[in-house]
Regions:
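Non-catalytic beta/alpha edge segments that cap or flank active sites
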Residues: 1-149
Length: 150
């Protein structure tokens, strides 16, 4: 009989960035989809937030999740496109000490096999202290594709 392997449980924060979602004009489907894709035996979701595309608020939340909540991983969804309001990558880099470019590159490469629009993503991955922050696209389907490549 195969023995069961014990894996560490990673503390995760999920942040959805959407002006319309924050204002109650659109239901957040991406944040809950991320949670569904994380096996409960390996990931403990300690926080799920829906915020507007406001850089200062995003930075504050990323700092809170990394420093106060001691998350191992923070997954953001949304705010990575070309709109002037899309500031998730800038907020992520502003609070991080090091970048982890291979992760965002892998997500983009995997997504490019499905849609060429993936090249329009400005998503980044970076590290704040001991917390890995990964920007994912804003739609539930794109979240699934991105999660499959990480």
């Amino acid at each position: 009989m195969a023995e069961k392997k014990d894996f560490p449980v990673f503390r995760v924060g999920i942040v959805t960035l959407s002006d319309k979602g924050y204002q109650g004009e659109r239901e957040d489907k991406s944040g809950p989809r991320i949670k569904e894709l994380l096996p409960a035996e390996q990931y403990e979701v300690v926080s799920m937030r829906l915020l507007p595309d406001e850089r200062a608020m995003i930075e504050e939340e990323l700092i809170r999740l990394a420093d106060l909540e001691q998350c191992d991983l923070v997954l953001t969804t949304g705010g990575t496109g070309f709109s002037m309001r899309d500031v998730t990558p800038e907020a992520t880099l502003a609070v991080s000490g090091r970048v982890a470019p291979g992760i965002a590159e892998a997500i983009r490469a995997g997504s490019m096999a499905i849609t060429k629009r993936a090249m329009l993503s400005r998503a980044v991955s970076a590290i704040r202290h001991r917390t890995l922050i990964i920007n994912l696209p804003g739609s539930p389907k794109a979240v699934e594709i991105g999660r499959a490549h990480v």
